[in-house]
Every structure is written in C-alpha cells, then in structure tokens.
C-alpha cells in the first residue's frame, strides 16, 4: 500500500510570470500547453489533460501536489495520514473533475505544502508526447511526471512521513558542503521526491526544482540551447548526476524555482532489492553553477 506516482502539480503564478512559464514548458521543454477559459495553462506530457497546471494567482507558489494511488488504497492511505495527525478532507466531485481525477482527498503538511491523494480518471494515449517524455506508466515501469525537490523544516520527520505513511523508500543520500539531501522513490523512477533542510538560501515550504525527463539526449541539448536563445537564465550547465546518473541541465524559472530537464535516469527494477547509496558530491561532471545574467 503506497503512492503509485507523482501525477500532477498545480502552481499559482502572477499573470506576467504565467506567460513566461508557458514559454518555459512549451518552447524550451517541448511540452504541449493548452489554455482554458479561465486563463489557466495546462501542460501536457502525455495523454492526461494536464501533468502541470499554471493557475493565475496573486503570488507564485506551488498550490497542490497530486499523488496518484490505486482506488483500493485510497481510503487506507488517507486513514494512515489521519493517524499521523494530519487532517484529511474528501474533495467534492467538482474539485475532483477540476483535477481530471475520479476521487481526491486533500491534506496540508507542516511546511505548508498541499497534498492531494487521487484516483486517476481514464485518459487517451498521445503517441507523440509519449515518444518525447518519460511520464506516467511506461513499458518498463511506473515513473510519474518527474521529481520534485523541496525544502522542509524537519527532514527526519518528513522523511518518516513519506516512508512510513505514504510508502516511499529511501534511494540514497547526497551530502556535500552546500547541502545534504535525501532522495525517495515510490516506483521505478530513481527518486520522485527529495528532501532538503534549509540550504542554498531556501526556506521551508519552498521548491528547489522540478525535474522532467526526456527520452533523448538531443532533446536536452536542444532545450539547453533554447534557454540561451530565448534569454532565460541557466542555473547549472549540462552535467551528469552521481546518484541517478541523469544527464541534465537546470534553468531558473520565472516562478522562483529551477526546472531540470534530464535524460537517462537510473531505473529501479526491483524495489525490494534496492540498496541505499551514499554520495559526497551531487554530480560526476558538469552542472557548473551560473550567475544570473540579469
């Protein structure tokens, strides 16, 4: 009984930032972005109506993290969350439809993140997008939309919540002078969430970065070139990570967090036999930190 995958993310953005984020996802990352009547931007990486949604709002913030669960596990996981002293609210049909979900249960954690346990509604395939992104359920396992690195006040308590309540496993730990991060998995993706204590100038409740995974190295290289061509800031140059072996770069998104686009992430074939790793550097090569251009 555990979360299956990171199914969707909802961000609120100021109007000017929302338009800039559309450029990030559509013109740099290569996703499909559709607009609805309310001015929201729906970012598609596969056939689901959205994997990332950008809602107009007064501030830039992560509004909801959608955790996909099996229908048979929803009530039990929600009960476990309640036992961990978090109040769980069953969303009505209108909110579930807004999330393109069959059922949704919400709770907020101590760092201010809103989590949504949801049962997926059926959606069509999209062969074009599915040829571009590692997302959702693939032939070799479940991967979800990508991974999220967040800043938390009490890392040990938060890690325990993810592992003991939501059913995640510890992938590895990377410790270097600037940060100390724990990486957690819930499926074949090396990590779906990573937890950091306050570091790198970030405070609890903030997002360090969102990672999306391309299916070709060329996609990453083209996106890296597009960042520069379109005048956005590179946060870290192309490099390869030590723990999940991803080839990637990071750009600084206008919404106040980084977006990583990677290729070739390590796959966890057998969750039961995974051995936790420990690393003293986040990258094997590259990923050189860049000063903002403006």
From Swiss-Prot:
Pathway membership, UniProt: Xenobiotic degradation; dibenzo-p-dioxin degradation; 2-hydroxymuconate and catechol from dibenzo-p-dioxin: step 2/3; Xenobiotic degradation; dibenzofuran degradation; 2-hydroxy-2,4-pentadienoate and salicylate from dibenzofuran: step 2/3
Gene Ontology biological process: dibenzo-p-dioxin catabolic process; dibenzofuran catabolic process
PROSITE patterns registered for this protein in UniProt: EXTRADIOL_DIOXYGENAS, VOC
Enzyme class: oxidoreductase
The keyword Kinase is assigned to this record: no
Residues annotated as binding Fe cation: 147, 209, 260
SUPFAM superfamilies: Glyoxalase/Bleomycin resistance protein/Dihydroxybiphenyl dioxygenase
Enzyme Commission number(s) from the entry: 1.13.11.-
Keyword Oxidoreductase listed: yes
Start and end residues of each VOC domain: 7-120, 144-264
Keywords from the UniProt entry: Aromatic hydrocarbons catabolism, Dioxygenase, Iron, Metal-binding, Oxidoreductase, Repeat
Gene3D superfamilies: 2,3-Dihydroxybiphenyl 1,2-Dioxygenase, domain 1
InterPro entries named among the record's database cross-references: Glyas_Bleomycin-R_OHBP_Dase (IPR029068), Glyas_Fos-R_dOase_dom (IPR004360), VOC (IPR037523), Xdiol_ring_cleave_dOase_1/2 (IPR000486)
GO MF term list: dioxygenase activity; ferrous iron binding
Sequence similarity: Belongs to the extradiol ring-cleavage dioxygenase family.
Function of the protein: Responsible for meta-cleavage of the first aromatic ring of 2,2',3-trihydroxybiphenyl and 2,3-dihydroxybiphenyl. 2,2',3-trihydroxydiphenyl ether, catechol, 3-methylcatechol, and 4-methylcatechol are oxidized less efficiently and 3,4-dihydroxybiphenyl is oxidized considerably less efficiently.
Subunit details: Monomer.
Name of the protein: 2,2',3-trihydroxybiphenyl dioxygenase
Organism in which the protein naturally occurs: Sphingomonas paucimobilis
Origin organism lineage: Bacteria, Pseudomonadati, Pseudomonadota, Alphaproteobacteria, Sphingomonadales
Gene (UniProt): dbfB
